[in-house]
Curated annotation (Swiss-Prot):
Protein name: Glycolipid transfer protein
Keyword Transport attributed: yes
Sequence repeats: 45-55, 56-66
Gene (name only): gltp
Cellular component GO terms held in the UniProt record: cytosol
Function: Accelerates the intermembrane transfer of various glycolipids. Catalyzes the transfer of various glycosphingolipids between membranes but does not catalyze the transfer of phospholipids. May be involved in the intracellular translocation of glucosylceramides.
Binding site for beta-D-galactosyl-(1->4)-beta-D-glucosyl-(1<->1)-N-[(9Z)-octadecenoyl]-sphing-4-enine: 48-55, 140, 207
Protein family (similarity comment): Belongs to the GLTP family.
Organism name: Danio rerio
UniProt-annotated location(s): Cytoplasm
Statement: the UniProt record of this protein carries the keyword Transport: yes
GO biological process: ceramide transport; intermembrane lipid transfer
Amino acid sequence: MALLMEHQFRQLPADKQVETRPFLEAVSHLPPFFDCLGSAVFSPIKADIAGNITKIKAVYDSNPTRFKTLQQILEAEKEMHGAEWPKVGATLALMWLKRGLRFIQVLLQSLVDGDKDDNNPNLIKVNVTKAYEMALKKYHGWIVQKLFQAALYAAPYRSDFLRALSKGREVKDEECLDKVRQFLVNFTATNDAIYEMYTKMNADLDYKV
């Protein structure tokens, strides 16, 4: 699990405020996760995540003191953009980023939970399907949904996927999954806090692409 464990997310403080700089540092290492899935069809999610990180970073870099937390960014943009908010700026970028992170979160949690197709236990199609349906499907139009259905048939074997997460090293599946569990603790808490923030601030949008 070296790919993810080398760049852990921070434990959240009691008030669940997500600090912008360490968050951006941690998420910047996540796009290569999609290379582990093997299919180029997943590259749009990878590109979307990378692009949204860049947009959020640009806003943060413009005033690191003012934008110390993600909530401070949303609050400032709400005041700045008025009726255009939340359809603009880092607020919109983070909205889509959290969905990409939820895809990763659900996929990894599904593997840890042992979800599998009893007829094909070494395929991760079940896990990828669950992640897509829970995180992204409702925001995709018919054409994009069909593209991802095609990608499912190119999903790698479970053993190959875990090996890719371990950067090609031969490690036991259970050893890799133990590290996935460790990674998920702060990663899940962080993304859940972002979802909660969007709900409280009424900043989520449900349009399709």
